[in-house]
Amino acid sequence: MFREGQTAQVLDTPFFDFIALAKALQPKVVIAENVKGLLMGNAIDYVRRIYKDFEDAGYYCQHFLLDASKMGVPQMRNRVFFVCIRHDLGVNFLKVSDLFNVEPHISMDFNEPGICYGEFADYMGKPYGKRMKEMFDNRTHGDIDMSNAYRKLTGKRGFFNQCYLYEDEICNTLTAHSDSAIPFKKPVYLSTAEVCNISTFPQDYDFCGFSPHYICGMSVPPVMMAQVATRVYEQWLSKL
């Protein structure tokens, strides 16, 4: 079980059904992604199975842990990408990757300059209710979240998930909850425009009645996906 946007996820049949579909269709390249937790603890057994199933499907498989904040996304968000190329095509790019493996070479190193919240902050979001406003009024510069103010007011522990956004810092991972990332400067939630910027969604995106926080918090940023796809095209597909 893994977590993305504070929602538990289980890697089960849909992921492996996707690999089975790739086996049937045999596209030149297959790209899949999942949460960082996939590489931790016992979950690594799933990674081994993913590699085996892609191998059986006729693909070389590699995985990369990528940070969106280094890819032109104003958000620190880690995702695991599985980048696979069909055996008959991958032989054109084989390179020794370590002492034991030969893999089709592709660089997934990114070092784009970070984009801080202050570059697009508009403070046009919904104002806080009474309880959130009270904790906001008891904040201290340097607070990471609302937990210090909550402890000051109640003597209890809590509100660790309401993380402050400073103008000179990059946003932490945006989750599906509207209070997961909140401006330190003003007592308002993030506006729709700010949420779209943080997740690199179009400003005119139609959320079809769903919360922008929910959709963006549960999605891989489009610019992050575009960066991976561009590398695949430039280093593999354009050379075939």
Predicted regions and their residues:
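Conserved active-site and SAM-binding loop architecture
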Residues: M1-L240
